[in-house]
Regions:
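N-terminal loops that bind phosphate or other acidic moieties
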Residues: 2-131, 135-363
Length: 363
């Protein structure tokens, strides 16, 4: 009689190709003889809204707002009771722009402010904010401008901001720990990915520093060097500085909401992964958080990714296996094709499980 094992799948998205839910579903097809459980997960970046809404059983609603180039769009967020789930990239995401439209200097987070206004009008007072995937490096200035326009200049600093700070709770879901400015700041580390030239990086970093200095003088405190202030182009800073937000690991926040540790108890194996796995994976990305919890529960954990670098470091960290799903020599263009990724992911999962349960993958 064949023994059936419980396999827990908890994948981050494969950026530009498959969402978290899609990756998990396809991988599970390679485990057809096993009992599988697929979790839709995110660390606060891409796919955050879908994953968190599912975990918190929130309804997705939408409103009119503006993208990073101030073009009118409809953007979604989650709402359950008095809690709103906001994915900043829904309003000012890099994925909303064509590559030739990226404007690292002019991109604005104004639309995020519009999402907040709509959620507040619907009664939201508790907020989970997913930071990541934005096209902006404005330190949250655009978001604050939208709130300023809504509240009016007379009320903004005197009554509106204090109410947001004192009557609402703000939880930032992110695993980014960079400060607002400096060598490890939002501009230096993330702006090049958003199309910034070296000269623009210098300009943006100086602009963020001026923004923080002005706020510190006016408010008497400075959050610019706090871990996570540089997340989402400095939106993290704006929430920390102006709203008194609390930064939490996006991955841990979601895994707790999914009761992940309980789900682990009867699992024979956990399989996690992301589009590209390397030593950065071990610096707080979602697969690392999955690994930590699996190790604590004494459940083996394997990693699958579209690309794998620093494999020995990944194995040394505790992954039982770390595999690239694509064969050697496959072009980057082919790797990003959805059907190619689906086929290779399902096949690699099947091969991994065969090896694992035949005891070919040792501790």
């Amino acid at each position: 009689m064949t023994t059936t094992h419980k396999i827990l799948f908890a994948f981050d998205s494969f950026k530009g190709c498959l969402s978290s839910a899609e990756v998990g579903k396809v991988a599970a097809e390679g485990a057809e003889q096993e009992k599988v459980e697929v979790l839709n997960v995110s660390d606060g970046g891409d796919g955050m809204l879908s994953a968190f809404c599912q975990a918190y059983r929130a309804e997705q609603v939408s409103c009119n707002c503006h993208d990073a180039l101030m073009r009118p769009i409809r953007a979604a967020y989650g709402l359950v009771g008095d809690m709103a789930i906001i994915e900043t990239a829904q309003a000012c995401g890099l994925s909303l722009l064509e590559s030739n439209e990226r404007d690292a200097v002019g991109g604005t987070s104004y639309g995020v402010g519009e999402l907040l206004i709509d959620a507040l009008d619907r009664g939201a007072r508790r907020f989970i904010i997913g930071l990541g995937g934005t096209a902006t490096t404005d330190g949250g200035f655009g978001m604050l401008k939208a709130l300023y326009v809504h509240a009016g200049p007379a009320a903004f600093f005197d009554t509106y901001l204090p109410r947001l700070r004192n009557e609402c709770s703000w939880t930032l879901a992110s695993d980014v720990r960079n400060p607002l400015y400096g060598p490890q700041g939002a501009a230096a580390v993330f702006a090049p990915q958003k199309g910034a030239t070296p000269a623009e990086v210098v300009h943006l970093d100086a602009r963020l520093q001026r923004l923080a200095q002005h706020a510190a003088r006016r408010m008497g405190h400075d959050c610019s060097m706090l871990p996570g202030a540089g997340a989402a182009g400095g939106l993290g800073y704006a929430f920390l500085q102006y709203f008194g937000a609390q930064m939490q690991s996006g991955a841990d926040l979601l895994l707790d909401a999914l009761d992940f540790d309980t789900r682990l108890r009867d699992a024979a194996l956990v399989i996690t992964g992301e589009g590209s796995a390397d030593k950065q994976t071990l610096m707080g990305k979602l697969p690392w958080h999955v690994l930590q919890r699996a190790q604590k529960a004494h459940v083996p954990c394997c990693l699958l990714a579209g690309e794998v670098s620093n494999r020995e470091e990944l194995l040394k960290a505790g992954f039982r296996e770390a595999l690239c799903i694509h064969p050697a020599g496959l072009s980057k263009e082919e790797q990003l094709r959805t059907e190619v990724t689906k086929n290779n992911l399902s096949l690699t999962t099947s091969q991994l499980l065969t090896r694992f349960f035949n005891a070919e993958i040792k501790e």
